[in-house]
């Protein structure tokens, strides 16, 4: 065994712990963002100050200034006129906490990355990927403000499309970190039929589409309408005149409450059916760890479907809505792991974390 091979487990472990903690922080960030949306707190801070905005108001004068800023936007004038300073503080803390967590994640990612690079602990083939993840994180901060800005001038809420982009980008970053963690583990590949790989990839792609659709539902508050199941608007499939009345037709996919909720339901049915097929196929093929992964993915999707139905029937209580969002993250995690285990190549060496140069070893 070479010295590099002997050192690999010891050198990989700190990197994997770091990425695991970052992934956990992102998952928490997504849930805090969900709570911020559900409590209608996302527009309480009307400025974007990436550095100086780290500190909250520290005295009465600063609190009054922040409140006066909120009073200038349509949401206050049309929905919250008469709100007290105490009520404003409640929504302010949600948004401030969400933004602070974003800053914490940036620091928790960048500083250890620089440390590992300085120590020579990351192999060249991973440097570009890790920097790309950081770049996506920086972009996510800008997208977050782009989303908030959509609700500051003419709307009483943020754009549902920008909200969906913001959430989906966060989950893409999360998925990239989960993928990297799995590859760094260096587990042996699973021999499986091409159809299993195809359905696993399809499940991951459709999961991301479904999460985007769910964000559209949330942004439009469409979950507070058509609160029946399995019927929607009195039918299994609503009338075309109700689904496609806006012009041009494609606007219905983003702006029509009925169409957006119907699309989210139909995608859920498709995902559940595909996951069931994938699990049965993996079991019949005796695909080893992939069979277990397929069963876990199907179980998580089944739980997610139940939570989605309950969230709809009870008209989006915060607890159920956040549970639905949390299980969505679990589904995405399992989908990423399933694709990774089925697409790992035998011909390639397992991803390496390089030992530090002798001069830098402690």
Swiss-Prot record:
Q: Which domain of life is it from?
A: Bacteria
Q: Which parts pass through the membrane?
A: 15-35, 104-124, 129-149, 161-181, 200-220, 266-285, 293-313, 316-336
Enzyme class, broadest EC rank: oxidoreductase
Localisation per UniProt entry: Cell membrane
Provide the Gene Ontology terms for cellular component.
Answer: plasma membrane
- One Pfam family cited in the UniProt record for this chain: COX15-CtaA
Q: What is its EC number?
A: 1.17.99.9
Recorded GO MF terms: metal ion binding; oxidoreductase activity, acting on NAD(P)H, heme protein as acceptor
Which of this chain's residues are annotated to bind heme? 264, 324
Query: Pathway, according to UniProt?
Result: Porphyrin-containing compound metabolism; heme A biosynthesis; heme A from heme O: step 1/1
**Major localisation:** membrane
> What membrane topology term does the record carry?
Multi-pass membrane protein
Q: Which cofactor does it need?
A: heme b
What biological processes does GO assign it?
heme A biosynthetic process
Tell me the protein family, please: Belongs to the COX15/CtaA family. Type 2 subfamily.
Function recorded in the entry: Catalyzes the conversion of heme O to heme A by two successive hydroxylations of the methyl group at C8. The first hydroxylation forms heme I, the second hydroxylation results in an unstable dihydroxymethyl group, which spontaneously dehydrates, resulting in the formyl group of heme A.
How this chain assembles, per its entry, is: Interacts with CtaB.
Report what the protein is called. Answer: Heme A synthase
């Amino acid at each position: 065994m070479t010295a590099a091979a002997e050192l690999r487990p010891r050198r990989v472990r700190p990197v994997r712990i770091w990425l695991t903690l970052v992934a956990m922080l992102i998952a928490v960030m997504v849930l805090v963002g969900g709570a911020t949306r559900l409590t209608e707190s996302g527009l309480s801070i009307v400025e974007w100050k990436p550095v100086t905005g780290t500190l909250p108001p520290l005295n009465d004068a600063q609190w009054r200034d922040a409140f006066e800023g909120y009073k200038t936007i349509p949401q206050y004038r049309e929905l919250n006129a008469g709100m007290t300073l105490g009520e404003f503080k409640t929504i302010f803390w949600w948004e401030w906490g969400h933004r602070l967590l974003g800053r914490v994640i940036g620091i928790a990612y960048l500083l250890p990355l620089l440390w590992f690079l300085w120590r020579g602990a990351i192999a060249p083939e991973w440097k570009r990927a890790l920097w790309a993840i950081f770049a996506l994180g920086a972009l996510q901060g800008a997208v977050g403000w782009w989303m908030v800005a959509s609700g500051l001038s003419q709307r009483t809420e943020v754009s549902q499309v920008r909200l969906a982009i913001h959430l989906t980008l966060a989950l893409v970053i999360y998925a990239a970190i989960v993928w990297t963690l799995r590859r760094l583990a260096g587990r042996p590949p699973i021999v499986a039929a091409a159809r299993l790989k195809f359905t696993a990839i399809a499940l991951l792609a459709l999961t991301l589409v479904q999460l985007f659709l769910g964000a559209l539902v949330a942004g439009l508050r469409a979950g507070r309408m058509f609160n029946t199941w399995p019927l929607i608007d009195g039918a299994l499939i609503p009338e075309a005149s109700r689904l496609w009345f806006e012009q041009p037709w494609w606007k219905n996919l983003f702006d029509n409450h009925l169409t957006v909720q119907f699309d989210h339901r139909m995608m859920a049915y498709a995902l559940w059916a595909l996951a069931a097929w994938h699990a049965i196929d993996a079991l019949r093929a005796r695909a080893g760890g992939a069979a277990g992964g397929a069963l876990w993915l199907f179980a998580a999707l089944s739980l997610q479907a139940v939570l989605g139905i309950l969230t709809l029937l009870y008209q989006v209580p915060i607890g159920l809505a956040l549970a639905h969002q949390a299980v969505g993250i679990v589904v995405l995690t399992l989908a990423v792991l399933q694709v990774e285990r089925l697409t790992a190549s035998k011909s390639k060496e397992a991803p390496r974390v390089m030992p530090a140069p002798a001069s830098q070893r402690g």
